Regions:
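Glycine/serine-rich phosphate-binding loop and adjoining beta1-alpha1 elements at the start
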Residues: 1-41
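Short acidic active-site motifs
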Residues: 115, 141-144
Length: 149
């Protein structure tokens, strides 16, 4: 495993562990005589190495996990880990020949913002791992959308 992948793997794992440490409710669903406690809902934005590790870790700990990515190949990977993949309506595959994400069009970004804004209304924890190689990490969730959490 190369250095970047190994560090991304650890970052995805640690992001979940730290997020759960700050979360003030139970993570897995619990059914007791007193009632049912619903599972925490986690959204992972970006399903590369770090994102997939975050999906796997959150799922293993009992959360309901949603994930999104601009690369269509990541849909199968997310679902194989037990996550639910969120697809932007009319989305285009934004994957380079090397398998990395590339910059999205303004129209795509608007549709993505609408999808995430609606999704955030039912999410407890958000983990952002989206990255475009050689560029600053994209701002995918606006401050206005964060109000819904």
């Amino acid at each position: 495993m190369d250095i970047l992948s190994s560090q991304a793997n650890l970052a995805g794992y640690k992001a979940v562990i730290e997020a759960f440490a700050f979360f003030e409710k139970a993570i897995p669903m619990m059914m007791t005589a007193a009632g049912t406690v619903p599972a925490a809902k986690v959204l992972v934005v970006g399903a590369g190495v770090a994102g997939l590790q975050a999906v796997a870790t959150a799922k293993r700990m009992g959360a309901v996990v949603f994930a999104t990515d601009v690369r269509m190949a990541s849909k199968e990977q997310v679902e194989s880990l037990g996550g639910k993949f969120l697809t932007v309506e009319g989305s285009e595959n934004l994957e380079t020949e090397g398998g990395y994400a590339k910059e999205a069009s303004e129209d795509f970004k608007k549709k993505q913002e609408e999808l995430l804004s609606e999704t955030l209304k039912k999410i407890d924890i958000v983990i952002c791992t989206a990255l475009i190689p050689g560029k600053k990490a994209p701002v995918i969730i606006s401050e206005l959308s964060l109000i819904h959490i």
